[in-house]
Amino acid sequence: MTAPSQVLKIRRPDDWHLHLRDGDMLKTVVPYTSEIYGRAIVMPNLAPPVTTVEAAVAYRQRILDAVPAGHDFTPLMTCYLTDSLDPNELERGFNEGVFTAAKLYPANATTNSSHGVTSIDAIMPVLERMEKIGMPLLVHGEVTHADIDIFDREARFIESVMEPLRQRLTALKVVFEHITTKDAADYVRDGNERLAATITPQHLMFNRNHMLVGGVRPHLYCLPILKRNIHQQALRELVASGFNRVFLGTDSAPHARHRKESSCGCAGCFNAPTALGSYATVFEEMNALQHFEAFCSVNGPQFYGLPVNDTFIELVREEQQVAESIALTDDTLVPFLAGETVRWSVKQ
């Protein structure tokens, strides 16, 4: 797998951070993931959030019902941690193979996170149980105090929450999701084998200038927010190094167009249709295509203790234009890189 390959064959990838929503939105977006990825970690921030085994089983079935015939896709369900969650319910879901991991949202950090955790101490019995049974903790790593600048929230989270937590529960497996800063890249790289990270395509391809200079681009607005270019470069260097505890997590987060193009727009990039080709472009730009397959298809399963997929897909290097929009009942979705010409795409 060396540039300038015209066709890139890799083991089927997995998406270790995905939002599928529910209802008509779910039915619209599921096929864009299920046609490419073997598995995906599905976020639980519905309204109401997924906090019980029964809710997760029902949601998993709704996802499977939306998978087109011929797609071989397994949704991996997560539990939304709350201050009042029963550790026994979490353990039951994990033992029954319903919950793959549990998600920590600091209260009000992102979309539908108002039920999130108010403090680590409030959920310590749950976290201690997770450490005991080997259940991974997935973390949206931002503090949400009103007096902390939005561009500093990830770095402050590391020092005030993440490091004290990992010092207290040394055997807990933690995924630091959608990292966006040099601080986080360095922290994960310097950590032990129980700490990993996911990175989105938008945080590898863009920085805050792309979102804000020459006009506001709402379809690049996501949380954690895009940072300055020194942070983008640190993320690119981390994936290009072949570091084996960082892996693909798109954080694909669809919102209808009118909810993005608004005076108070929603955070999230719907990147499922274009993410894999976007990652390939970054790896090619960094002269690191030899590490692309591991990032997409190997590092994640290894950290989670799951087998790699036994099928393969191909990406083709030829210019294609991304659709301007995707139909959604009585609205539209605007995909990541809408209307732009991309270099790599999945071979159909």
From Swiss-Prot:
Changing residue 255 to N: Lack of activity. GO terms for molecular function: dihydroorotase activity; protein homodimerization activity; zinc ion binding. Zn(2+) 1 binds at residues 17, 19, 103, 251. It is an enzyme of class 3 (hydrolase). Induction: Induced by pyrimidine limitation. Its EC number is 3.5.2.3. Belongs to the metallo-dependent hydrolases superfamily. DHOase family. Class II DHOase subfamily. This is Dihydroorotase. It comes from Escherichia coli (strain K12).
